[in-house]
UniProtKB/Swiss-Prot annotation:
This is Small ribosomal subunit protein uS2. It comes from Geobacillus sp. (strain WCH70). NCBIfam families: rpsB_bact. Pfam families: Ribosomal_S2. Belongs to the universal ribosomal protein uS2 family. One of its GO terms (cellular component) is cytosolic small ribosomal subunit. Keywords: Ribonucleoprotein, Ribosomal protein. The lineage of its organism: Bacteria, Bacillati, Bacillota, Bacilli, Bacillales. One of its GO terms (molecular function) is structural constituent of ribosome.
Amino acid sequence: MSVISMKQLLEAGVHFGHQTRRWNPKMKKYIFTERNGIYIIDLQKTVKKMEEAYNFVKELAANGGKILFVGTKKQAQESVKEEAERCGMFYVNQRWLGGTLTNFATIQKRIKRLKEIEKMAEDGTFDVLPKKEVIRIKKEQERLEKFLGGIKEMKELPDALFVIDPRKERIAVAEARKLNIPIIGIVDTNCDPDEIDYVIPANDDAIRAVKLLTSKIADAVLEAKQGEEAVVAAE
């Protein structure tokens, strides 16, 4: 049985690509037809590619691998946070800070600062500081939490990236490629699939489509974790 059905994909509008004038010819093999100036994605290929991505993620997670979910466009922000948290993985859903992967040590310093501020809030340091200073530090905390909250516990580079719209997240994709980190991507008809190791051809603009596919990636992680728990229980 496939991990996702044609019916689910159709209902979520996964088949709607971009306007025909905004396309990348490299996506031609994933296009079924054209309707009213819009490309229609071949959902049979989406089912097959989703299966490949699902199995890759499941295997990676079963071996203790960590995945970073990346989606900073409005339609993806909520799903990325919810699904990454649901399966216990990391996420970036605001702005991708340049160097998040390629300058990991600097990002870790910012995370350390965020944790220091959190500790100050807990241990009563705020109570003895001047009010103005507390307000300034809290603003800094808010900013750091906004951009780094989803990778706060990421102690080392992730083993894979799951990206919604590689065109929008081109900096993240370039950094992962530089470091040979595999990339799974929801790739619409206007994107370059060559940059992505596991291409899921799909509509990357509809909230329902993004939610459905992101939830399947999270399901793959959870299935792997349940497998681990079953093995531990059997021992």
